[in-house]
Swiss-Prot record:
Matching Pfam families: TCL1_MTCP1
InterPro entries: TCL1_MTCP1, TCL1_MTCP1_sf
The entry's keywords: Chromosomal rearrangement, Proto-oncogene
Protein name: Protein p13 MTCP-1
Quaternary state and interactors: Interacts with AKT1 and AKT2 (via PH domain). Does not interact with AKT3.
Disease implicated: Detected in T-cell leukemia bearing a t(X;14) translocation. Plays a key role in T-cell prolymphocytic leukemia.
């Protein structure tokens, strides 16, 4: 579903709990993994959720999602494992800001 452009995406997304991230403005983002046969995607939506205590990184080791994403040139994010994620879209979808990120293959 197409949506309207919402400007610049967040500069940073830090994991708070499994599947829940915070940006530099303390907004919460919910991330869901979408596995395809040959690649991994993350659908990340800016949804206000109550935050409990932050999870320890050691408790998140089984997640396919990174601990942190940082905005990188050319419409990409780099994660804490130095992997690049392409921004496939950054739109407002049904009133919710959404990023669709695709993990790029290692070169």
């Amino acid at each position: 579903m197409a949506g309207e452009d919402v400007g610049a995406p967040p500069d940073h997304l830090w994991v708070h709990q499994e599947g829940i991230y915070r940006d530099e403005y303390q907004r919460t983002w919910v991330a869901v993994v979408e596995e395809e046969t040959s690649f991994l995607r993350a659908r990340v939506q800016q949804i206000q959720v109550p935050l409990g205590d932050a999870a320890r990184p050691s408790h998140l080791l089984t997640s396919q999602l990174p601990l942190m994403w940082q905005l990188y040139p050319e419409e990409r994010y780099m994660d804490n494992n130095s992997r690049l994620w392409q921004i496939q879209h950054h739109l407002m979808v049904r009133g919710v800001q959404e990023l669709l990120l695709k993990l790029l293959p290692d070169d």
